[in-house]
Amino acid sequence: MLYGFSQVILQGALVTLELALSSVVLAVLIGLAGAGAKLSSNRPLALVFEGYTTLIRGVPDLVLMLLIFYGLQIALNSVTDALGMAQFDIDPMIAGIITLGFIYGAYFTETFRGAYLAVPKGHIEAATAFGFSGGQTFRRILLPAMMRYALPGIGNNWQVILKATALVSLLGLEDVVKATQLAGKSTWQPFYFAIVCGLIYLVFTTVSNGVLLLLERRYTVGVKRADL
């Protein structure tokens, strides 16, 4: 049913999944750092991340992606020229991970900031009273408590990142979008392969929903739900 393009499309789907997972890891790390910075008493650092989140959320993803990709390429070429080295192109996968991670790190920043503020202060005070260090308090008390509040936002951000990987095909990445486009052009069946591409993304998001539901159950153990 895939006119001999099954292997190409499967490889593209794996590339898409690798890109999404790598990007979300980078975005989570940036988000945790950004949330800590915005909540810190260091005013200049908080202002830097405030500007970062405002900029990212106010400019379309595609525009940011092109700006970051070409900006990195220009900066890299400037360095190689200054060192007398030959120019080389940034790998599309690396470029995609950096751009998506940087863009969605802003959204994770707000997700984790809100989750931190939702944790009762008594949790931290109790950890301090028991002699926990700052790192122990974060790992054993704060992070597990935050996850319950952050999971809905994390799930939403993951779904958006997963779908945003389709934009990285514009940077030359041979992902599932590029693979299905190639198959559509080669077989004169663009609409059919667009449906195939959409179904692959639907499978990814459906499986993701199941995993997120399991995580939500894990982190809400002992929490009573109110029936409205």
Q: What are the roles of these predicted feature ranges?
A:
Residues 1-228:
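Transmembrane alpha-helices and adjacent helix-loop boundaries
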